[in-house]
């Protein structure tokens, strides 16, 4: 019983991420409106800041109409599975120095596992709807996720080779001298492309291509189930993948400025722990917000590509490049270490 309560408590601790998702939808709309030279949402609340809550209330109050021949249980279960596994990844993220929900040595492996399991929710939702558009969208999404998850694992393998650890806190602390984005800049660019494809975002949103599949695997979902699928699960995955990118390549909660501002004044006698944790969390938030902005920027700038082009780029261009890096980079590092020892 105690174990069950502990598991439920740790899961509930991930729910504040849903509030971040609400404001992310607002910021995306306002950013895209600015890029397209229009006003965007500005009616509900001050400067339109309550628009996401109004949309959520509208979807909650709508009647849910399920397809006649659909498997109702799996149709409901698919979005819920996707949302649960999208939120579970937040448990192992170090939000600051000593500020985390759970910290264990296989943190990055845990995130890869739960992100892979979210694919089953998409597959269930598409198959159980008894609709050709939803089924084709779920098949596309599954093929796309499997392909680009393979790439992400190779990219993360390089970071593990640099640090020798699967612990996210250790990976962050290993970047005190230099962020990994500098020696691994080409890897980071390809990794970020893989992250966009992993989250089904434009220009890789082929699983829900409106011109081909209506709304893909979400075609037959409406009301609160659509809100779980689109507003919550998808945007929670975007925030999680941006946090993971900042942890792996941008130093996570490490200070953005070259100066160690934590030691500018003596805070040992007054709120030292709270101040340091707050500053470190702010650093992570700024880096994550920048990556989310790049997500939105890419969506507003590039048209959707064809599905065969997406898969071809993955298997014929990006995968050979990353395999070459995985083989050559350790050889270069070992060679440099040997030459230094000889000197």
Swiss-Prot record:
- Lipid bilayer topology: Multi-pass membrane protein
InterPro entries for this protein: NADH_UbQ_OxRdtase_su1/FPO (IPR001694), NADH_UbQ_OxRdtase_su1_CS (IPR018086)
Q: Quote the subcellular location field of this record.
A: Mitochondrion inner membrane
The enzyme's main class, written as a single word, is translocase
A GO BP term, please?
aerobic respiration
Statement: the UniProt record of this protein carries the keyword Acetylation: no
Reaction it catalyzes: a ubiquinone + NADH + 5 H(+)(in) = a ubiquinol + NAD(+) + 4 H(+)(out)
Pfam families per the UniProt record, alphabetical: NADHdh (PF00146)
Cysteine disulfide links: none
Looking at the UniProt record for this protein, which Gene Ontology cellular component terms does it annotate, in alphabetical order?
A: mitochondrial inner membrane
Q: Which GO terms describe its molecular function?
A: NADH dehydrogenase (ubiquinone) activity
Its EC number is: 7.1.1.2
Q: Keyword set for this entry? A: Electron transport, Membrane, Mitochondrion, Mitochondrion inner membrane, NAD, Respiratory chain, Translocase, Transmembrane, Transmembrane helix, Transport, Ubiquinone
Q: Which HAMAP family match?
A: NDH1_NuoH
Q: Which family does it belong to?
A: Belongs to the complex I subunit 1 family.
Q: What does this protein do?
A: Core subunit of the mitochondrial membrane respiratory chain NADH dehydrogenase (Complex I) that is believed to belong to the minimal assembly required for catalysis. Complex I functions in the transfer of electrons from NADH to the respiratory chain. The immediate electron acceptor for the enzyme is believed to be ubiquinone.
Name assigned to this protein: NADH-ubiquinone oxidoreductase chain 1
The root-end lineage is: Eukaryota, Fungi, Dikarya, Ascomycota, Pezizomycotina
Which gene is annotated as encoding this protein in its UniProt record? ND1
């Amino acid at each position: 019983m105690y174990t069950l309560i502990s598991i439920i408590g740790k899961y509930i601790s991930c729910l504040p991420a849903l509030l971040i998702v609400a404001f992310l939808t607002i910021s995306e709309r306002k950013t895209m409106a600015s890029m397209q030279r229009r006003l965007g949402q500005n009616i509900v609340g001050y400067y339109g800041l309550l628009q996401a809550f109004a949309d959520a209330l509208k979807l909650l109050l709508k009647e849910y109409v399920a397809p006649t021949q659909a498997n109702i249980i799996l149709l409901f279960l698919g979005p819920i599975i996707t949302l649960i596994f999208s939120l579970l990844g937040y448990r192992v993220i170090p939000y600051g120095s000593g500020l985390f929900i759970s910290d264990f040595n296989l943190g990055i492996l845990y995130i890869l596992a739960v992100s892979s399991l979210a694919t089953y929710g998409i597959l269930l939702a598409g198959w159980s709807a008894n609709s050709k558009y939803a089924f084709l969208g779920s098949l596309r999404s599954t093929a796309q996720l499997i392909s680009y998850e393979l790439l992400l694992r190779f990219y993360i393998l390089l970071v593990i080779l640099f640090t020798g650890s699967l612990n996210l806190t250790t990976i962050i602390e290993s970047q005190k001298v230099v962020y990994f984005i500098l020696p691994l800049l080409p890897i980071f660019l390809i990794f970020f492309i893989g992250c966009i494809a992993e989250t089904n975002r434009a220009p890789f949103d082929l699983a829900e291509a409106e011109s081909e599949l209506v709304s893909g695997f979400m075609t037959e979902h409406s009301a609160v189930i659509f809100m779980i699928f689109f507003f919550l699960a998808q945007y929670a995955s975007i925030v999680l993948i941006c946090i993971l990118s900042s942890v792996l390549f941008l130093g996570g909660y490490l200070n953005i400025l070259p100066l160690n501002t934590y030691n500018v004044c003596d805070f040992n006698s007054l709120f030292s722990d709270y101040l340091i944790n707050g500053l470190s969390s702010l650093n992570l938030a700024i880096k994550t917000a920048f990556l989310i902005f790049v997500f939105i920027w890419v969506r507003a700038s590039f048209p959707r590509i064809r599905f065969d082009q997406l898969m071809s780029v993955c298997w014929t261009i990006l995968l050979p490049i990353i395999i070459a890096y995985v083989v050559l980079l350790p050889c270069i590092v070992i060679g440099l270490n040997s030459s230094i020892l000889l000197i």
